[in-house]
């Protein structure tokens, strides 16, 4: 087997594994609430929106100079809670429990330090692909 054949076989193997993995399409809020300058590339030059979404990524070609296929914001319990950490408005106090936060009808996520863990939700009216 020549070098070119090995490269082709490797490319087909990677594509096959990607197809088997099958990712869930992100929600509109996971895509549209991410600032263009914070996008992390998730595709290759010339990728289509369908290919991008099939990989579990977001697609938006309306802004030049930034990736069009990009990784989404992390999934939350509710789309109202999907936002960049810089957009969080505090709804609690240091050490608040998830239960107390929920009783205030707020969102809770304690994965990132030095940002509000209990924060106000946002309307999903502004979310779009």
From Swiss-Prot:
Tissue expr: Stomach.
Keyword annotations of the record: Disulfide bond, Repeat, Secreted, Signal
Biological function: Inhibits gastrointestinal motility and gastric acid secretion. Could function as a structural component of gastric mucus, possibly by stabilizing glycoproteins in the mucus gel through interactions with carbohydrate side chains.
One Pfam match: Trefoil
GO terms (BP aspect): chemokine-mediated signaling pathway; maintenance of gastrointestinal epithelium; negative regulation of gastric acid secretion
Listed name of the protein: Trefoil factor 2
Disulfide bonds: 29-127, 31-58, 42-57, 52-69, 81-107, 91-106, 101-118
Secretion signal span: 1-23
Compartment(s): Secreted
SUPFAM superfamilies associated with the record: Trefoil
GO MF annotation: an example: CXCR4 chemokine receptor binding
Assigned GO CC terms: extracellular space
Record bears the keyword Protease: no
InterPro entries: P_trefoil_chordata, P_trefoil_CS, P_trefoil_dom, P_trefoil_dom_sf
Domain named P-type: residues: 29-73, 79-122
Organism name: Homo sapiens
Predominant cellular place of this UniProt entry's protein: secreted
């Amino acid at each position: 087997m020549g070098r070119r054949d090995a490269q082709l076989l490797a490319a087909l193997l990677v594509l096959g594994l990607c197809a088997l993995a099958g990712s869930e399409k992100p929600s509109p809020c996971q895509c549209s609430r991410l600032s263009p300058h914070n996008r992390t590339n998730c595709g290759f030059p010339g990728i289509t929106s369908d290919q991008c979404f099939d990989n579990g990524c977001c697609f938006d070609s309306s802004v030049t100079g930034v990736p069009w296929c990009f990784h989404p914001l992390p999934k939350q319990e509710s789309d109202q809670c999907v936002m960049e950490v810089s957009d969080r408005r505090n709804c609690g106090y240091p050490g608040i429990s998830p239960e107390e936060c929920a009783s205030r009808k707020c969102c809770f996520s304690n994965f990132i330090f030095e940002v509000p863990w209990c924060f106000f939700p946002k309307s999903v009216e502004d979310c779009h692909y």
